[in-house]
């Protein structure tokens, strides 16, 4: 597979670009009843995200390509099928090679849909 299935890419769930922390991403989000979120991101180009932190844990699963979790000077490369948990409050950012797809689970609301963005 080179992309997520169409049913996972409903335009109503498209993540607004201000939630991406990295240019060139295409993302979709689903919400849990407890306020958690699952996000699916694909990118066509290489990129490095902005450093940030969350008030909740983040789980990352690399599906395709390579995603590198960066925490301070530590770099954790994730190949397809590899996963990592970023504890809440930890400053981090990610790096992607072209064609990378990832799934992220957040213990709180992280992503804003295009339809929710108030600019």
Give the location of each predicted region:
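Short strand-coil-strand connectors
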Residues: 33-34, 70-74, 97
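Ligand-binding loop in jelly-roll beta-barrel domains
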Residues: 88-114
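A short, N-terminal "cap"/entry segment at the start of jelly-roll beta-barrel domains
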Residues: 1-40, 50, 119
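Short hydrophobic/aromatic-rich beta-strand segments that constitute the beta-sheet cores
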Residues: 40, 69, 102-104
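Short beta-strand/loop turn elements enriched in aromatics
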Residues: 35, 45-55, 111
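Short acidic-glycine-tyrosine-enriched beta hairpin
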Residues: 73-88
